[in-house]
Design a protein with these regions (language model features):
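Intrinsically disordered, low-complexity, Lys/Arg-biased terminal tails
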Residues: 131-221
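Beta-strand elements of modular eukaryotic interaction domains
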Residues: 36-40, 60-61, 71-72, 111-115, ...
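Glycine-rich loop/turn
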Residues: 44-72
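Core residues of folded domains in eukaryotic genome-function proteins
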Residues: 43-47, 68-71, 118-122, 152-154, ...
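Short active-site loop/helix that positions an aromatic residue
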Residues: 80-90
Length: 221
């Protein structure tokens, strides 16, 4: 059991899990924290949770996306993470066209953000019912610095859709094939993916060109 999981058990004794989506919008500011408290275990980076939801029938653009995405909390320590996360609705309980994002503080989960502009993302499509477990596993891998690619990781996203759910991890430099390959291989390991799992990569520049997150991707095994 690693440090993140051990401290999770301690927090769960004190905090009850909220199962309502309303927690995202109502009275959420009381969770905000930007520096570790006394005696807490600091994360290597501060991380910010974001939430977005939109109507699929409406075409997406930069302005509407920025209006729909909401910053909900920033955490700086292992303890702060578990305290907030234990109140957060699980992705599998979200409805409609919704996304949770967890990014390094200061990086917006937008293709156009300076930290993301030259980057891209790995995409894993999940059948319904798996999103909550995979989301937690990829978060713990990122917070625990398991990817071993320096400052390349920007954040992770879980996207809830009607027919499938999608997990993605964003990195800064799409042209660095050594780094993107290492991220892919680490994803396979930490998520315990079968060898024949299809993984897709898409640069943010391509997403800007075709105004889509998950179409026209490059597929790899």
């Amino acid at each position: 059991m690693n440090q993140l999981e051990h401290l999770k058990d301690e927090e769960e004794e004190e905090e009850s899990v909220c199962s309502r989506e309303d927690v995202i919008r109502n009275n959420i500011n009381r969770f905000k924290a930007v520096c570790p408290g006394a005696g807490e275990h600091p994360l290597q980076y501060n991380y910010t949770f974001w939430y977005s939801r939109r109507t699929p029938s409406r075409p997406a653009n930069t302005q509407s996306y920025e209006q729909n995405i909401r910053q909900i909390s920033t955490v700086a320590s292992v303890e702060q993470f578990w305290k907030f996360y234990s109140h957060l609705v699980r992705p599998g309980d979200l409805t409609g066209h919704s996304d949770f994002h967890l990014f390094k503080e200061g990086i917006k989960p937008m293709w156009e953000d300076e930290a993301n502009r030259s980057g891209g993302k790995w995409i894993i499509r999940l059948r319904k019912g798996l999103a909550s477990r995979f989301w937690e596993n990829i978060i713990l891998a990122m917070l625990g610095e398991q990817f071993m690619v320096g400052e390349e990781i920007c954040g992770v996203v879980v996207s809830i859709r009607f027919q499938e759910d999608i997990l993605s991890i964003w990195n800064k430099t799409a042209s660095d094939h050594t780094t993107t390959s290492r991220i892919r291989d680490t994803l396979r390991r930490v998520l315990n993916l079968p060898p024949n799992t299809i993984m897709e990569y898409k640069t943010h520049n391509d997403s800007i060109k075709d105004n889509s997150s998950f179409r026209n991707t490059k597929i790899t095994l």
